[in-house]
Amino acid sequence: MKKLSLIFLFLLCYSTSFAHYLWIETSPNGELNKKQEVKIHYGEYTYGIIEQTDGDAFKSVSKFEVWIINPDGTSSKLDLDKKEDHYLGYFTPTQEGSYTIQLKNDNIDVVDFTEYDFGIFKTYYQSFAKVNVSDIPTASTITEEGLSIKEIPTGNDEKILQIFYKGAAISEQEVKIYVSDLWSKTLNTDAEGKISFKLPWNTKYTIETTKNENVPGTYNGEDYEFIWHCATYCFPQSN
């Protein structure tokens, strides 16, 4: 019985760790020539888990890059400082329009979860956020690599997101919406790769979608069977 209890505890910890994700927090509205704050977190927001940057969990996914994509399509890498439970950076908008913030991390060691019937895989994290510096917001920018989440302006309190995989919209893609206190909702994309929903509470929402790319390869001398893609988007609490 004691052995079974230990196995259950280990599996619970494994499941919690595996469900972690990176996400970006920033104000959705910016101002010309005024510094914009950007934070990078790792954990599980709905469970109240925010990993410490000096902990092993965050260290294992800390080789990420964050890019600012300007309204004119040019981009620049964001410099980040390590804080206690997040990475912090700033950029200053100099153009009117919508800015896309993109995090990408495919520099993560291969993981062997064959014991748990998941296989041997390499993780590819991407996170997105949008900052409007205009009275007329436009859609955010997508990437041609992995999973992308694009926010489409609606002009009302409804949110529309479109999910892309390697630049193409994907239908029937499962998307999870999380808030604190273990509340979550699952939606599936339509034929155009879109989901729509409202934000009924003034709180932070994190959105996550994942996909397996069943192509084997090698990373840092370790073979893997597939790539596990994970993309996130965050709507911060309104001030």
Where are these regions (language model features)?
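Sec/Tat signal peptide C-region and signal peptidase I cleavage site
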Residues: 13-19
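Start-of-domain marker
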Residues: 19-81
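Short acidic/polar inter-strand loop motif in beta-rich domains
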Residues: 47, 106-113, 213-218
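Beta-strand-rich domain onsets/edges
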Residues: 20-39, 115-159, 168, 181, ...
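Short, aromatic- and glycine-rich surface loops/edge beta-strands on solvent-exposed regions
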Residues: 95-109, 204-213
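Glycine-centered loop-to-beta-strand initiation motif
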Residues: 84-89, 189-199, 203
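Sec-dependent N-terminal signal peptides
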Residues: 4-13
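Short amphipathic beta-strand segments in non-cytosolic proteins
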Residues: 64-74, 174-186
